[in-house]
């Protein structure tokens, strides 16, 4: 067995008990029942769409136009740009919050703990309304890109701070004590011993958090930023095709999230880490 595989099994077994034959049989039965139920629901929905005329060519023909897909591609690029920028900001801010919360300075610990809980507890939509409605009253006007990106980043930073902290807590305490016995400073212990191992543990979870960031960008219509959802709303207005457009957009978002989740699972297998959900 490879080093990575052994590590992965050890970490996974530490959190979850491996299912036995009976449990695996129950899982297979439950999966089969779920698939049948989902298939039946899909058939029912399609039947209702057919009855109400939503499957008519009238509501789908514009998807044969190249301009439609170019318009959606522009929105997709906008979504990716916001998600990556917000994710990068959240990564840095989340790490800073974790470092502050685990520092020896009591006031800094308190401030970072309060900020972490605040960012985690407040929906990103409320942050967007604050940037969109409140800040302009104080003569602070930001481009629509930043009115969407910064709120999404703040909401994600609180979650990432806790993920970082979970990774740090997963590092064996004995390694820290050994480094202290050698006279290393706390900064060197943190950045040369603890963080490299912690990041290895949490990389899959960090990638998975990008799924949440992508979902949070769907409220871009509030600030009229031309992302995938905003451009979808334009198509709906122009062609009066709500169901067909939203179905296509849903498929695109599902594919995006599947790719991100597959990346997280791949990294998990390579690093031997366990995805925190």
List PLM regions with ranges.
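Transmembrane alpha-helices and adjacent helix-loop boundaries
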Residues: 2-277
